[in-house]
Amino acid sequence: MVQATLRLESQWPASPAFGWALAPLEVSVLLSDDEAVQALNAQYRGKDKPTNILSFAMEEEADDAMPMPIMAGEPRLLGDLILAYQTVQREAAEQDKPFDQHLTHLLVHGTLHLLGYDHERSEDEAQQQEAREIAILAQLGLPNPYL
């Protein structure tokens, strides 16, 4: 397992893709294996299978909450992202995408969950989250992952 705490201060917070000013953000990232992620997925989501990424926010959002802007100021710990290495690697190969691009997409996807987005809440929110992902990845010079 590989664990790191990332501080997102460079291109991402200044990106117009967000639509608001962000304080420096900290995210703990754990690159784990399918077995460990499957156990966490079963425990916290009731799904006994591995998934590519799990997001655990430091602050819980209400079920119907929309993402709220984080205003500039002190660094804020958003939460934890846990990725299943084998699943991410397999998906990248199946989708004929470079591993690093797929991994970056999942990190953006998971971070948006930490910011309050939830594509499972409604179709409208799924479209909003997908549009944000595409815009952020474009700012990083990466292609639309949904094509």
From Swiss-Prot:
**Entry's transmembrane regions:** none
Q: Which GO terms describe its molecular function?
A: metalloendopeptidase activity; RNA endonuclease activity; zinc ion binding
- Summarize where Zn(2+) binds, as residue positions: 109, 113, 119
Instruction: List the cysteine pairs that form cystine.
Output: none
- By its UniProt entry, which PROSITE patterns does this protein fall under? UPF0054
Q: What class of enzyme is it?
A: hydrolase
SUPFAM superfamilies, alphabetized: Metalloproteases ('zincins'), catalytic domain
Per the UniProt entry, the Enzyme Commission number(s) are: 3.1.-.-
Instruction: Provide this UniProt record's keywords sorted from A to Z.
Output: Cytoplasm, Endonuclease, Hydrolase, Metal-binding, Nuclease, Ribosome biogenesis, rRNA processing, Zinc
**Which GO terms of the cellular component aspect does the record hold?**
cytoplasm
Subcellular location, in the record's words? Cytoplasm
Q: Which note does the record give on the cofactor? A: Binds 1 zinc ion.
Q: Which Pfam families match?
A: YbeY
Q: Which GO terms describe its biological process?
A: rRNA processing
Main localization, broad class: cytoplasm
Write down the required cofactor(s): Zn(2+)
Domain of life of the source: Bacteria
**Which PANTHER family does the record associate with it?**
ENDORIBONUCLEASE YBEY, CHLOROPLASTIC (PTHR46986:SF1)
Extract the HAMAP family matched here: Endoribonucl_YbeY
Q: Which family does it belong to?
A: Belongs to the endoribonuclease YbeY family.
What function does this protein fulfil? Answer: Single strand-specific metallo-endoribonuclease involved in late-stage 70S ribosome quality control and in maturation of the 3' terminus of the 16S rRNA.
Recorded protein name is Endoribonuclease YbeY
- Which species is listed as the source? Magnetococcus marinus (strain ATCC BAA-1437 / JCM 17883 / MC-1)
Query: Gene of origin?
Result: ybeY
